[in-house]
Amino acid sequence: MGNAAEKITPAIAPARILIEAEAGHFQPSRLEIIDQPKFSSGKGIALKSGQLVDIYKPSAVADIAYEFNIPAAGRFDLFSWAATDDAAYCYIWIAVDGETPRQKVVVSPWKDLSICKELLQKADLTAGRHHIKIWLPEKVTLDRLELLPVRIHGIPDSAAKYNPSIVPPATRPRLMVTQQTLESVRKNLTVGENKEIWESLKKEASNPYVLKTDTPPPPKSKVKSKKPSPQIIGVFEDEKALDIAVKKAFVCLMENDKAKGREAVKLIADYISKAEFGNQLDVCRKIGFLIYSSALVYDWCYELASLDQKRIIRANMMRLAEDMEIGWPPFKQQVINGHGNEAQLSRDLLSMSIAIYSEDPQPYKLCSYRILEELVPGHNKDNRSGRHNQGGSYGPYRFGWDVYAAWIFYRMSGKKIFSADLKKVPYFWIYMRIPDGEMLRDGDIFTSGKYWSYAFNAFLDYTYSNDPLLKGEFIRQDGMNWAKKNAVLFLLLNDSSLKAESSLDRLPLTRYFSDPLGSMICRTGWSFDRNSSDAVIEMKGAGTYFGNHQHLDAGAFQIYYRGMLAADLGLYCFYGTPYDINFNKRSIAHNLMLVFDPAEKFSEGRGNDGGQQVLSAYSPNGKILARDFGPDLQKPLFSYLKVDLAAAYSNKLSSYTRSFCFLNLGLNNSPGVLITFDRLATVKPEFKKYWQINSYQKPEITTDGFVITSIQPENPGKLIVSSLLPKPSNREITTSGGNDANTVFGRKFQAPAALPEAAGWRTVIYPKVASREDLFLTVMQIADGKAPPLQTEQLNSQVNIVVAVADRIVSFSRNTATIKSAMELKVPSSRQQYHVLLCDLETGKWSIKEKSGKGLFNAVVKPDAGTLFAILQSGEYIVSPGNNPALPEQ
């Protein structure tokens, strides 16, 4: 056996203590030393082939035993480095100084599996000799252990000197309810939908509850550590106890039932003093829920707790606060985005700080500084858009914690900390909802189900905004079932007098989202049924790239009609895997322009997908140049967006603009048309330009484009794609997919799930002849499976590029500049009249006359639109800048 005592040199200072894996006592019959070039010593230790984890026998002997010296007492972080071939959670078991073995994550599936670093636990160690025992799992090679003194993050001077403008009241309760609001909450308990939930809560709170202090006996069979055991050894969690304790405290508060209040205090004091958590990702969410629940009981039952119980609860809340990802003091993470913008600060630590404010005001000062001086100003800027930068799953989740913080402050002080724009943001997810109950994809998506639900967030949204439409959305998400499981929060905030409005028909069919996330979502209706005839189209612009779960997809589009037609192909499982950073989050998984420079390098080992550059967070990725919809703002005939996207790409592009125009045709079998017009110039003509669209099924190539059919088995939708530019003589169309769907210019990445996206198809249009500048004009007709193609033609002039489809005409500037001079417009004779949209016009007054000289009317082109809409008979016209006093105003 190896001898740890002989091989480890005692540290002369507690700054860093390194323990090589192969330097301990181990059983040669079970373990072997393996060469690993990436490891610190070039070697590691692993179980021999055929050996299984055997910890569950009482007489089990550790696989490896280490002995080491600590020259000075301190609190240490204990880290491990390990490797595996399996992209799954891998667990070791560890015991420090004879304590009960604890199961800890040693490899996380999204990290570098060849050398994965994990924080196993914290350890308070005295000066002198210490021991660590390790039980290894299969297929894991241990590199080393390392002890580092726990780093306490400093408090910025501005936070240390901060005097909050809003402080908790001296009276109790003060958390989620105050003396001023207590009576209204009590009166609302037996009104409307609250009554049943209140009666059920009281019944549950009346039952005694025994804390589960013992770990259940482990199964007798051998268990592979790749999957966690039913109860992780050495980890004590009992979330049911928290639920019961808070319900007892709530009944105490509502009915002055002191007996239940004392029961709640005892449950929390007993639990929090024993609670211990593992090291798996996001464990801070469980820790935080314990802190929050403890804070509620501490505040609501304050007069019923003994001095010793108060001390225990306060001390352990502060102990657990150190294990939060954001740390304590809470400055380890930024709060505008990421895990720092979740419950840990906005609910958990904030609630703790309010509950203990009378005894210690420092925690509240630090939490309120980060929220009121950092999070609120930053998100007030973001909320102007009405869109959330973290997309369809993480967006509502993180936004919900903003609203939670807003509720906590409002209930405590009567003051609203966010601007009124906060109330706009929930409508982003309403507009993203597609008829089958899912949503258009945006960012990393983990939501599933027939009707994607985020009822917790929808509840906070409608209660804070007092909005009947948002309450209707909560009901659609099976919200009342959620309410039964979250009875205390529901009864605290739900106003039974607010009646849910189920229909969304009074909402405009197009919604524009402004800077910093400029974009537009267009709908043809508000029905939610898989066989609905409603289409949903997203035209994504640009503004700011925030990073994290946001994708590199500025300028992308999506189309839904009886199934996804223009789809995102990325799937999200784990953050930062090779597939995630090379395909899922990258431009190639989206419907946008790719420009391939074979010499382009992307950061952090990412491959070249020809797409947008990996920007640092909060960088500009383009800007909206023009936008408009109308003429009826409720049911617009056209929706137009123009965006400058050059900033989203590297310097391989010298300029790039994309114009979108969605035409709502109002036809049963052809609800609409999406037109994209791209003008881009590269610094070198040989850089290949690709107009890309993704689909779940293989497209059928046609003479002028291709047809995509949705995978919906009954009444599928189809997308008839016509490429008008490049011209046919200079145009190639290719498609690839199935097993090659996730291949990025020769490099294949394995998708994490067997969903339609994993075997989708990527179709590209590109010019045959290399040129510095190219134009792409593409018309996409949305239709049911039996509808014939609509007639499409070009009617170009020297000034503009014109598309006619069905009874619509859309004109774009032929040049990069806006149109400032008179131009001719030919309206074909195939129909009696057309709805005409002229884009890219100079701001100001314009007039339209027949070519024969008869004047028709004047119109004003708005500076943020650059458009002129008119209904014209077939014929020839002249559109001129300037006002003709003899003509009527449009």
Residue ranges with predicted function:
Residues 174, 179, 189, 194-198, ...:
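Aromatic-lined, polymer-binding surfaces characteristic
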Residues 62, 88-90, 119, 128, ...:
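Residues that flank catalytic or metal-binding motifs in active/ligand-binding sites
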Residues 5-166, 176-178, 845, 849-871, ...:
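Extracytoplasmic
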Residues 480-712, 770-785:
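Catalytic and substrate-binding regions of extracellular carbohydrate-active enzymes
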Residues 148-217, 228, 253, 298, ...:
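Acidic/polar, glycine-enriched structural segments that form the non-catalytic walls/loops
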Residues 49-52, 62-66, 116-120, 627-628, ...:
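Short structured motifs
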Residues 507, 511-515, 526-532, 634-889:
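Beta-rich accessory regions
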Residues 356-359, 397-565, 759, 764-775, ...:
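Carbohydrate-active enzyme catalytic cores, enriched for enzymes
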